[in-house]
Amino acid sequence: MSGKVVKVSGPLVVATGLADANMSDVVRVGPQRLIGEILTMKGDTANIQVYEETSGLGPGAEVETTGAPMSVELGPGMIEGIYDGIQRPLEKIVEKVGACITRGVEVPAVDHEKKWEFNAVAKVGDQVIGGDILGTVQETAVVLHKIMVPPTMRGTITSIQSGSFNVTETIATLKTEDGREVPLTMLQKWPVRVGRPYTKKYPPKRPLCSGQRIIDTMFPIAKGGTAAVPGPFGSGKTVVQHQLAKWSDVDIVVYIGCGERGNEMTDVLREFPELKDPRTGESLMKRTVLIANTSDMPVAAREASVSTGITIAEYFRDMGYDVAVIADSTSRWAEALREMSGRLEEMPGEEGYPAYLASRLAQFYERAGSVECIGSDERRGSLTAVGAVSPPGGDLSEPVSQATMRIVKVFWALDSSLAYKRHFPAINWLSSYSLYLDSLKPWFDENLGPEFMQDRTKAMGILQNEASLNEIVQLVGKDALGAGDQLTLEVARMVREDFLQQNAFMDVDSFSDYERQKKLLGMILSYDVLCRDAIAKGASAQELFQIPAREQIGRAKSVPAEEYAAVYDQIQSDMEQQIAAIAAKGGDDE
């Protein structure tokens, strides 16, 4: 069915003669067949959001509806891929039309010609329901792609075979309950605005290990959780997001560059293939899907990119994998919503954002979770969503930050004052929080011992005491404080500089596992306890601050992974001896 354009306003096109079209249908606009999506219908008039540049388009141009909603292709070949916001493969587009994307270019999202080795798991005669696994394809060295029955189908398998197939060839035939024979391929399509179904949602109870000490120890996120990384420009949001994408102990990472600089996506493409996953030893790119929707691409496609990314992530979650979606940045996505809302002449909300901003953000974050996947084998999968927020001027009272804070359960607030002091990650320990601490405590107690959470609480207490002591120090100076308070300031400095600070560009320090984090924090707190005992016996605080072991603790995080256990034990032993010697001398002086 086709209609005619009557108005063009930037990415918004108004067309008439589309009485039989539906909301969310994909349309092709004009002679160049630009991709668009119907936002609203009124009679036979449709407001269409066009995902490509509309210059040169005018009234009278033809609009053709496809009759299908905005969907993504799901199948083998997505891992290591780099897509734009509407799942067009950028590498294939370069091969077809060169470095500049021409308007209306059509390239299948998944390679339809490439052959994959399919190993059948199901057998003829098996009764299957949506989500059941038909077979597997070894997509990369680390990802075993499970080919599933589409979620809406059920029936009996009448034929299935292993072998070499492309994604459009029939691998099995399903006889449905109404007697129809349906051919099944390795390719599925799913509308991006609709969450993929699951059987049951569970409270998240396993932590996501990111290798970043301030995140894992102080403000942990659970697998299946939601987190926001708000911060002003230059505070290190993108580096935090890159660190999460590099080192998180998940099976698949979907990285959405939504409206950010092209250089940042280039960094990912340059670094990830060279970096090795500490758990598998393979290149990080072999578990990553990239969606690049940079700031110079059409604004409307930003709005689609987040939905595209999370739909791809849900597909891998349905296989029983732990998946992380990292969106950088949701503020740019909200700005795209604001622009389209303004063009539609809708009633603006706070700061010009549409009134439905909070509900759209919630739709994104609520698709995260730890779930029992559909299918008869009770697979468990998780989808963790992390979104960066870029509030203008670092003002966390603006609408996107406030709406995000109401939805997410982990808030890593980046602070420009810490970034200017070269303290990275610049996560402010006084304004950040994690609401998963209680639900993760049983896991920490079982795997790391109850002292891990106790040490975390002690360290947070020391940092809070430091903040209140700093006000006094500014008035009367450090020397006016008692020895105990001076020790609190010194230990807080050790926690900040020797534990929380982490160098993302230093191979040894970029990733730190839980056991190492526990030992390092335990060593700093042990220094605190031993020094307090020594001060009580009359030892000089200044002498205690200058022991050789104090400097060794400062260098402990740069010890190679294979040596750290022995080195940390040696530092602990040296520290105990050196403090005991000063304590004995302090007692003798009295």
Task: Describe these PLM feature segments.
Residues L18, Q32, A68-P69, Q87, ...:
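Short, surface-exposed secondary-structure boundary micro-motifs
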Residues E95-P150, N166-T226, V240-Q243, P278-M297, ...:
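P-loop NTPase nucleotide-binding/switch module
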Residues I535-E590:
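C-terminal amphipathic alpha-helical interaction region
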Residues T40-A46, P76-Q87, V143-G163, V182-R196:
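Short, compositionally biased
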Residues T217-M218, G224-A549:
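P-loop NTPase catalytic core
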Residues P11-T16, A46-E52, H112-K123, T156-I160, ...:
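Short alpha-helix capping/helix-loop boundary micro-motifs
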Residues G36, D44-A46, A68, M153-I157, ...:
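Metallocofactor- and cofactor-centric catalytic cores in central/energy metabolism, strongly enriched
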Residues M1-T102:
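N-terminal accessory targeting/assembly segments
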